[in-house]
Amino acid sequence: MPSLSALAVLATPLYRAYFATLRLRGLLADGTTLAPAQYAYGPEIFALCECDAVALAGLIAHTRLTALVALGRDGDWASGILARLGFGLVRGSSLRGGAGALAHLIRAMRASDAPGAIVVDGPLGPPGEAKPGIVLCAQRTGRPIRALGVAARPKIVFRRTWSQIFFPLPFSRVVIACEEPLTVPATTDREGIATLALELTGRLATARQRAQAALGAMRTKGRIDGVVPAYASPSTSAETCAGTQPTSGTLQAPTLGDRR
């Protein structure tokens, strides 16, 4: 049986070809839309939920990212592919190797101006809930945090995974919404870090809602129009990854086992 590293080598060109088919569109906090290649990438930390991870991996075509990847078999598989796609990787999670991984990630970010990326609700959830590690990382590096939210159509949603991670089908429309930067003062105490993590959770939900609204506008008008700026109050309750309901263009994959 081929090793994970061998499978990663074989899968990498397929992932590159797949990502090239996605019709990605970025949505800024003020409602401006642009292609991901037009975004001014800099020393910031992208916060994302695990459900959005596959779609967001396509950003590597436009910039080099430093990402935190969980330990374990699934993490080994993902890191093998991501490394070959050009990601800088640090391994660990809140359950395994967390403190050491955070220290390595901070050093990597201090040594580079490239953006970082952290899945904030892994490795086991709750879905959409930001943990404090990313806030600590922002505090110690002086980098702002940008919450990202994704909507895609058509897609496959793996309903039996804890995060309900989704896979945009080839040639899908994908909208990536980002929020205003969240800054973390160097003097922030433990209570303040917890408060900012809660605020980040809300921003992630808002970003996803804005991405969904923009994608719906694209479907009805053939373009992004009437989208919700990040500073506006959402008209409906924010959704987490697991709380998002199936919409037209969404296929369910109910037989996939939980791959925690």
Model regions and ranges:
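Membrane-anchoring hydrophobic helices of lipid-metabolizing enzymes
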Residues: 1-55, 59-62, 169, 201-246, ...
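Short, hinge-like loop/turn segments at secondary-structure boundaries
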Residues: 83-86, 108-109, 163-168
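A cross-family acyltransferase "interaction/gating" segment
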Residues: 131-189
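Generic beta-sheet signal
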Residues: 92, 119, 147-150
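Catalytic core of membrane glycerolipid acyltransferases/transacylases, capturing the structured
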Residues: 43-97, 158
